[in-house]
Amino acid sequence: QARLEQSGSGVKKLGASVRVSCWTSEDIFERTELIHWVRQAPGQGLEWIGWVKAVSGAVNYGSLDFRNRISLSRDRDLSTAYMDIRGLTQDDTATYFCARQKFASRYSGDQGSYFDLWGRGTLIVVSS
């Protein structure tokens, strides 16, 4: 069954760093254009963090704050994407999700512009 797997939840100290991993099979990864990262703080809606291109490793971020504190990357050989957050604040307490955007297909008419696979989420709690 096609799916994305994520690393486990954890409690982190203020100012610390954390890495969240998102991995899948080689077959799925090679048919993926973008791995998106989004988060959901308690009682809030989804917030888009950014994406990393599965093949090239190019990145794009949703805000300047994310660009300054979050690094998105991928290891193609391991079919894994990473999100590294530094300088954690209590506002970073959230569940973090990775989601796949596959390549568009001109043959099927599939634009590929939606998230068809999601990870189960990684809860990060920032504590003083």
Language model features with spans:
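Extracellular domains of the immunoglobulin superfamily
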Residues: 1-128
